[in-house]
Regions:
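Short amphipathic alpha-helical coupling segments at ligand-binding clamshell hinges
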Residues: 64, 138-141, 192, 231-246
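Flexible hinge/capping segments at coil-to-helix
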Residues: 46, 128-146
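Ligand-binding clefts/hinges and TM-proximal coupling segments of bilobed small-molecule sensing domains
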Residues: 75, 154-171, 208-212, 241-255
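Bacterial N-terminal signal peptides
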Residues: 7-16
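Extracytoplasmic small-molecule ligand-binding "clamshell" domains
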Residues: 23-102, 110
Length: 255
């Protein structure tokens, strides 16, 4: 009975959230992290207009956001925000949720709440297909390599696990890392596998090094999963958890 009452209360809070004028679910994302989220100039079947112009957002995160908004009975609004500004934007009320390929790390949990994960991946290093590291199968193979990662992400911090690495300055976003690799300024950058595959589609001269068991990065489960970020104490948390848990594996693959 107690669990039932708690569930009813949570539902009432969410309904109250909508009735109080929050008819739109404002979602913050970078719109620059394919295949999770990106910006395009033309509308598409599943693309969503970005607030205040600037094109349309699409990608895996956008499809998750569409499902969440639909099942909450709310309109979806995408708020394009630089990666570093996402937590602050959420806490300041600029948007209601972060759906941006963000991992629920312990550090982030100090300031915002996270839902259950909606995606899980692994870490690879994106390299030139014809470069000296294309056949690498272990971190040790990258000794002396110039490697970077995105600023303020755990992708950058794990570079320290590479023996003898020539760690480069962190770059602001994946576009900057792609340009740096293509121009030869770096030998590789750390990415999750989906991001690496997306980069290869746009840049056929790219490849990526995946690692044999025990030869790759040591990571925590929270580092390689992706979840929705919410304000501390958000009434949306339980309901969004239910929605995410209701998305079948088949639906996730099709997205």
């Amino acid at each position: 009975m107690r669990k039932l009452l708690i569930g009813i209360l949570a539902l009432m809070l969410v309904m109250g959230y909508a009735l109080a004028g929050a008819e739109t679910l404002r979602v913050g994302m970078e719109c620059n992290y394919a295949p999770f989220n990106w910006t395009q100039t033309e509308p598409g079947e599943y693309a969503v207009p970005i607030k205040d112009g600037g094109g349309y957002a699409d990608g895996y995160d956008v499809q998750i956001a569409r499902i969440v908004a639909e099942q909450l009975g709310m309109e979806l609004e995408i708020v394009k925000t630089e990666w570093d500004g996402l937590p602050l934007g959420l806490m300041s009320g600029k948007f209601d949720a972060i759906i941006a390929g963000m991992s629920p790390t312990q550090e982030r949990k100090l300031s915002i709440d996270f839902t259950v994960p909606y995606y899980e991946s692994d870490l690879v290093i994106v390299v030139l297909k014809d470069g000296p590291y294309a056949q690498a199968t272990s971190l040790a193979d990258f000794a002396g390599a110039r490697i970077t990662g995105q600023l303020n992400t755990f992708h950058y911090s794990v570079i320290d696990q590479i023996p003898g690495v020539n760690k480069q300055t962190a770059l602001e976003n994946f576009t900057a890392m792609i340009v740096a690799l293509a121009s030869g300024r770096i030998d590789g950058y750390v990415s999750e596998r989906p991001g690496a595959l997306s980069a290869m589609i746009s840049n056929p001269e790219f490849s990526f090094a995946a690692f044999e068991d025990g030869q790759g990065f040591e990571t925590l489960a929270e580092d390689i999963t992706v979840a929705v970020g919410l304000q501390k104490g958000s009434p949306l948390l339980d309901r969004i958890n239910e929605i995410l848990e209701g998305i079948s594996e088949d639906e996730r693959v099709k997205m």
